[in-house]
């Protein structure tokens, strides 16, 4: 009788991928990147083990929105002080800090556990076309849609 394969840290091979965000829709890109970070694109996926790969996203400042989300979608944060609610539109966040826009979207699709935090640390987002990870020899990743 065969045993079900369970991955562990010793038999996981991690790859580095570069994804160009230019002209991509925010949600569609984020869901695909979240699946790569979790390792769901591999046959060795194991739910309780971090089997995912490293992802580098370039050109985050050229991400696109559908509809009127650039003006209508709002991001909120609160300082836990009275009157400490700060809101910013998606378009303004894209202009000021496009890296945070993508990181927030992708990390929201990962589990809210210690494993999810570990998976989120394998994400690197850059607003421009350059990245400092050439030594890792990343492969270009073609998105499905």
Swiss-Prot record:
Keyword Chaperone: no
Keywords on record: Ribonucleoprotein, Ribosomal protein
Keyword Protein biosynthesis: no
Region entry Disordered, spans: 72-91
PROSITE patterns: RIBOSOMAL_L13 (PS00783)
Gene Ontology CC entries for this record: cytosolic large ribosomal subunit
Pfam families tied to this protein: Ribosomal_L13
Entry-linked InterPro entries: Ribosomal_uL13, Ribosomal_uL13_bac-type, Ribosomal_uL13_CS, Ribosomal_uL13_sf
Subunit record text: Part of the 50S ribosomal subunit.
Function statement: This protein is one of the early assembly proteins of the 50S ribosomal subunit, although it is not seen to bind rRNA by itself. It is important during the early stages of 50S assembly.
NCBIfam families: rplM_bact
Family: Belongs to the universal ribosomal protein uL13 family.
Protein name: Large ribosomal subunit protein uL13
Lineage: Bacteria, Bacillati, Bacillota, Bacilli, Bacillales
């Amino acid at each position: 009788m065969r045993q079900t394969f369970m991955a562990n840290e010793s038999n996981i091979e991690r790859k580095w991928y570069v994804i160009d965000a230019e002209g991509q829709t925010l949600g569609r890109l984020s869901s695909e990147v979240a699946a790569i970070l979790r390792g769901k694109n591999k046959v060795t996926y194991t739910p309780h083990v971090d089997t995912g790969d490293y992802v580098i996203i370039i050109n985050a400042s050229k991400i696109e929105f559908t509809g009127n989300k650039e003006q209508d979608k709002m991001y909120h944060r609160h300082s836990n002080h009275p009157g400490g609610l700060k809101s910013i539109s998606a378009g303004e966040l894209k202009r000021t800090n496009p890296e945070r826009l993508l990181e927030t979207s992708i990390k929201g699709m990962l589990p809210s556990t210690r494993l999810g935090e570990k998976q989120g640390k394998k994400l690197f987002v850059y607003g421009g076309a350059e990245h400092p990870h050439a030594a890792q020899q990343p492969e270009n990743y073609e998105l499905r849609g």
